[in-house]
A protein has these predicted regions:
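Conserved coupling segment at the C-terminus of the helicase ATP-binding
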Residues: 1-218
Length: 218
């Protein structure tokens, strides 16, 4: 679960944005890449100012309820400039040289990642948690639950055997199964696409424990 959460956690730093902007400017010089560079520089300045403002304020260095006001506009400009640049790169379909195609894919991937992350930060809902990490001046966005990620990318695609040393809750594993992404009980009304495995087709088995909890429990 922790590894899945880490894998889907979004991170945005000014350094990453500026590196993507530098790649784009080298690959596709012009006003669109200049706009992205300017947006990246503005975001860098805004993050630096925010970092200075929250020094010593530990309440602003951990979890945030929303994007800080001073960062919202710079992030929006980054997202819009990056998205516009991705559209231009997609429209550049005349490249036939394999090396140039590879370079385009690399630049597009870097810029698209920035656009996607910035967009998710701006649309953050109650199902996500946002926090600021001051050491590397980083914004992190992570889902509170990864059950939907595991369900759509794993449980509906492959048969899964899940094992856990976790004790049952209420004499069953329903809570644990739901946290992994299985569909349990009254939840089993989701539409399954053709070719997918039904995540409600679940068998649970408690094999007991070799420990005598009454005498060996701490």
């Amino acid at each position: 679960m922790d590894r899945t959460t880490q894998a889907v956690t979004e991170e945005l730093t000014s350094g990453r944005v500026q590196r993507a902007a530098a790649m784009a400017r080298k690959y596709m010089p012009g006003k669109p890449s200049d706009a992205f560079t300017n947006a990246a520089d503005s975001f860098h300045d805004a993050m630096a100012d925010y970092g200075e403002d929250v020094k010593g304020d530990f309440s602003a260095q951990g979890r945030l309820e929303e994007i800080p006001i001073s960062l919202e506009a710079p992030i929006r400009k980054v997202k819009e400039a990056a998205a516009a640049l991705v559209q231009l790169i997609n429209a550049d379909d005349e490249i036939i040289d394999p090396d140039e195609n590879a370079e385009r894919a690399r630049v597009k991937g870097a810029v698209q990642e920035i656009a996607t992350t910035a967009g998710k930060l701006l649309k953050m809902g109650n199902e996500h948690v946002l926090w600021y990490e001051p050491t590397f001046s980083t914004l992190h966005l992570a889902p509170l639950s990864v059950s939907h990620v595991l369900r759509s990318n794993l449980l509906t695609q492959n048969p899964v055997i899940a094992t856990s040393a976790t004790l049952t809750v209420g004499n069953n594993f329903d809570a644990m199964a739901r946290s992994i992404g299985f569909v349990v009980g009254s939840d089993a009304d989701e539409e399954i696409k053709p070719g997918e495995i039904d995540p409600a087709n679940l068998q649970m088995l408690d094999v007991g424990s070799p420990f005598d909890f009454a005498n060996q429990g701490v």
